[in-house]
Every structure is written in C-alpha cells, then in structure tokens.
A protein has these predicted regions:
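Cleavable N-terminal export/targeting peptides
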Residues: 1-29, 194
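Short glycine/proline- and aromatic-enriched beta-strand/turn motifs that initiate or cap beta-hairpins
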Residues: 21-72, 186, 190-194
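Residues that define the transmembrane beta-barrel architecture of outer-membrane proteins
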Residues: 28-30, 49-55, 86-94, 110, ...
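Extracellular loop and loop/strand-boundary signature of outer-membrane beta-barrel proteins
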Residues: 42-45, 80-87, 133-140, 171-176
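Gram-negative (and chloroplast) outer-membrane scaffold detector with strong preference
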Residues: 58-133, 162, 191-194
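Predominantly the C-terminal beta-signal and adjacent terminal strand-loop region
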Residues: 78, 153-194
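Hydrophobic alpha-helical segments of small multi-pass membrane proteins
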Residues: 116-120, 148-152, 168-170
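Acidic, glycine-rich flexible loop segments
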Residues: 138, 145-156
Length: 194
C-alpha cells in the first residue's frame, strides 16, 4: 500500500514540477482540452430516448496578453422522435476561436473568459438514410454548415498544468435544416503540454 501511495505522489508531483506558483497563461503555452455536455435541453438522455449531447477536442495556444487561440473539432447530436423512433441529426464542425480573460483572481486560480469562434462543417440527418421503416421519407439530407459561436468559460486551475472547464456556448449555424441556434453547456479538462 505504501508503494502505491509513493508512486501516486511521485506522479502528481511530476505533473506540476518545473514551474513556480502562478505560472499560468504564459505566452506560448499549448494545451489540449476535452469538453462534453448537453445541447439545448441540457440532459444527455430525455425520457423518450432522445439524446442531445456534444463532445469536442481542441488545442489552445496562449498569446502574450493572456488571450488564447482555440483550434478544435466538435461532434454534436440531437435526436428527434418520430413514431417512437429516434431520428438523429449529427453535426461535425471545426472551430477557430479567440478567447479573452474578463475577470480572474490575483493568483489566476479562477478565470472567466469570453470567446468568439468561427465554425464550419457538415450536418447529416438520419445518417444519410432517407427512408424510414414505415415508408416515410426524410427530406433533409446532408449539408454543409457554417456560422459562429459565442462562449462564456470558467477556467479553474487544479494545478499549473491541469485546468477544469465549465463552458456555455451559443452556436449560430446556417445551412442547417433543423434550427440555427443551439446552446451547449459542458464540462471539460485542459492539460498544458509544454
């Protein structure tokens, strides 16, 4: 048991080694982040079996003024019920965003940021299958989508290299057949990799 505790202690200390206190938002820092959460209804699964969720993977690069660029990929799915069958509408988007710090404490343990993003990608309805089991036809097919997003994000530093994220993003996408505006609420984690 003592050996396991020793190994865990060494592993945790090695993650935060090499930097002094509050070495956060330094120019040139690069991070990788994973975020997941709910879309519009903020529940992953509704009682009717519908799923409304998103997941994203992104890289960040910090600038001199504590702002950062975000380069990400996003997968969002919303299901609509028809005759007790869930019809999925999936969106695959790329994101290029710019985030600025609005408010933070003195040690930069907690930071509130606002971000603006450009989005572009592809949307598919019912995975490209236009005929339903009862013979009904889905008239919406796949389409290219484009637009932007406005994000409010809380970054909570667990260590200098591990950041807990809480984000609310409003996406405005055009070229879609099922609603232009979608709100995402998600939790995530970012690891500073350099």
């Amino acid at each position: 048991m003592q050996r396991i505790l020793f190994i865990l202690t060494v592993a945790v200390l090695s993650l935060s080694a090499g930097e002094a206190y509050a070495q956060r938002d330094l120019p040139g820092q690069t991070g990788i982040q994973f975020t997941s959460g709910g879309v519009n209804h903020f529940l992953s699964w509704k009682s009717g079996g519908e799923r409304h969720y998103f997941t994203s993977l992104a890289f960040t690069h910090t600038n001199r003024n504590r702002t950062y660029w975000l380069y990400g990929l996003d997968y969002q799915i919303k299901e609509y019920t028809y005759e007790n069958k869930a019809i999925p509408k999936a969106q695959f988007t790329g994101e290029l965003g710019y985030f600025i710090p609005v408010l933070s404490d003195k040690g930069r343990n907690v930071c509130f940021r606002i971000g603006l993003s450009a989005l572009g990608g592809f949307e598919t309805v019912n995975w490209g299958t236009s005929l339903l089991p009862d013979g009904a036809a889905v008239t919406n097919g796949g389409s290219f989508i484009y637009g932007g997003g406005l994000t409010a994000a809380f970054d909570v530093y667990l260590t200098d290299r591990i950041i807990f994220l809480l984000q609310v993003k409003e996406r405005a996408l055009f070229g879609t057949d099922a609603g232009n505006f979608h709100t995402q609420v998600g939790l995530g984690v970012r690891f500073i990799i350099n």
